[in-house]
């Protein structure tokens, strides 16, 4: 959606009352990513591994480290929507959802956010948010998220798991709330795949045989998700 159409959409969605030549100003709308993690759905081993993971606050590219929701019409230009904003800082919002997902998945015996809040962690999960935006291509809308995650052993820094996702999902009904809904579903997809991959790596780390199943990661990490 181009800037002119976007403004028409915002103003068209709200009543415009004119008093003495002055028009009303549209209200800001605040959004947050959200989904309910499903317990055990992505697990290959039903038991938690005997270790503690420290979830480090995710980093985010500077262009996306702001309250305004980002939209783009080309790979070379970013635009910021003044009337649509995140209710929580994007990096904190995504880290919080990752934390909830890890707890629900029961992947490990403990997940902490700080070193001083519980048992000493064995591993650290970190992430970099490279993109979080709405892509408008003429008549097509897409939700887009790019994210890299790394699970490393704290004692020696060795990496057990590292994966980069760059995914988009088409938004068929062109409403801002639907973009947020599809961004949420993309993050859930990323976490399901990541937990499955970490399940395999941790099983190997602890010498645990997994049930007979395809332990390879066959789901795409880049491109369009339908």
Question: Where are the language model's segments positioned?
Answer:
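Sec-dependent bacterial lipoprotein signal peptides
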Residues: 1-22
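A structural "domain/chain start" motif
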Residues: 22-92, 201-226
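Surface-exposed short loop/turn segments
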Residues: 24-42, 105-156, 172, 220-226
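Soluble periplasmic/extracytoplasmic beta-strand elements of cell-envelope proteins
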Residues: 52-57, 70, 124-130, 144-150, ...
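Short secondary-structure boundary motifs at beta->alpha junctions and helix caps
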Residues: 77-87, 155-196
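Structured, soluble extracytoplasmic/luminal domains of envelope-associated proteins
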Residues: 84-106
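Sec-exported extracytoplasmic/periplasmic mature domains
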Residues: 99, 103-107, 195-199, 203
